[in-house]
């Protein structure tokens, strides 16, 4: 069941927070494929897609945030690196809640990456870029 599909801005956090407790009560692992979101249930699984490249990753929501009200999601360091935004610090993204297969859930709970997702097609990226352009930043 997909009940959340939004566009906005992603940033990343946590390089210095290793071992701290997340809102889910788990120890934060900066290199894990995890993220913080304000409202999605803990845990939730989302595909995060960059709107400039189409690159898509699967992450597990296990924390609350981002602190910045203009951000939709805060990625762990590992997720930011996988999405290719660790250097720039921020990117326009689509965040879509998904229900992955059990093997992917197990991998993410263990701090490992799930198999790569296909890149988003250019036609869909154009539509989503128009949606995010209407957001006030």
Residue ranges and their predicted role:
Residues 1-137:
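Secreted/periplasmic proteins
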């Amino acid at each position: 069941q997909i009940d959340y599909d939004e566009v906005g801005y992603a940033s990343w956090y946590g390089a210095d927070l290793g071992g701290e407790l997340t809102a889910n009560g788990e120890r934060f692992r900066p290199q894990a494929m995890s993220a913080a979101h304000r409202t999605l249930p803990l845990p939730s699984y989302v595909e995060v897609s960059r709107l400039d490249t189409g690159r898509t990753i699967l992450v597990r929501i296990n924390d609350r945030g981002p602190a910045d009200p203009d951000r939709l999601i805060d990625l762990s360091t590992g997720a930011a690196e996988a999405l290719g935004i660790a250097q720039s610090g921020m990117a326009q993204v689509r965040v879509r809640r998904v229900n992955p297969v059990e093997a992917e859930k197990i991998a993410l709970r263990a701090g490992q990456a799930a198999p790569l997702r296909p890149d988003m097609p250019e036609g869909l990226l154009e539509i989503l870029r128009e949606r995010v352009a209407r957001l006030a930043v």
